[in-house]
């Protein structure tokens, strides 16, 4: 770590993927940056841990697809800088009924943005993917750019490069107080720091930090069951067999997504894009009825559509989502203190977009014009935003 005083150009709270990319962009631009993390690294308490995430350009909204174009470039740049593979192209298969409006919207977005994709009829699907069973006349959309990000490796690479660039990462330091002003003061369990600007990327702990600053965002913290299902024939749903990532759009009340067997030999990762509302400090409490219901939905999906997998998960892990009502991010400055920047509400789809999110948060913290239109991400879009203390 570089030797620094306790005064910084910027302090970033939260060393998940969004905070790491924010600190990365700050350090890249020769800013003195302190990245604070309440837990000792690595940890599995938040939203950025685990071996894999889906990367894709397939979105209903043009603005995400446009952001993803730059994200792919930055992910590739990070791979070169780290000297290690962080991404594998597998393609992404989106599944839905022929009438599904979401599938049509995504196809239109990919066409407008010039993204390589392919529409697959029911007949095409059965020929192309014999190890998937199609029971409802499903059609498919293949995002040729889709693939897998190696999440834990990416976090380690970023934290290492931040330090190489002169930034400082302090883990095991929980923030206990933020005093607004110029400079802003951040007090942790160990000491106090000051900076010209502060970026808060604290995931499910965001509102705990914001409440004393007079605002509360409409964030729902969800506990997600991350399930791994054993192949009956090893390798049949693996990366080596060119099996794609999958995203089921209307095969359950919420999306179901799957990643080819990779991190656990012979186990495919399949998850339900929903969970039950829990406090992040209580995520390890006994399972609720909602948990059981979520896993039952996945069991039915696997039994109906993936006959080459055992019908019950072999491994179940936990992850946290922090959702906004519209499932779009919050990237904005505090309405009263413009040197406090907030990145929150990544709603279970933020990891792949972190290279551009970090760039935007860096720009906001340095009072630079943002590279993208931030209208979809302003906190003012929520009428329920509490400003009781402003």
UniProtKB/Swiss-Prot annotation:
Q: Return the motif ranges for Microbody targeting signal.
A: 388-390
Quick one: where is this thing mainly located?
Answer: other
The annotation note on the cofactor reads: Binds 1 FAD per subunit.
What NCBIfam families does the record tag this protein with? PRK11259.1, soxA_mon
Q: Which residues carry this modification: S-8alpha-FAD cysteine?
A: 319
Sorted keywords for this record are: Acetylation, FAD, Flavoprotein, Oxidoreductase, Peroxisome
Write down the Pfam families for this protein, in alphabetical order: DAO
Question: Which gene is annotated as encoding this protein in its UniProt record?
Answer: Pipox
Would you tell me the protein name for this molecule?
A: Peroxisomal sarcosine oxidase
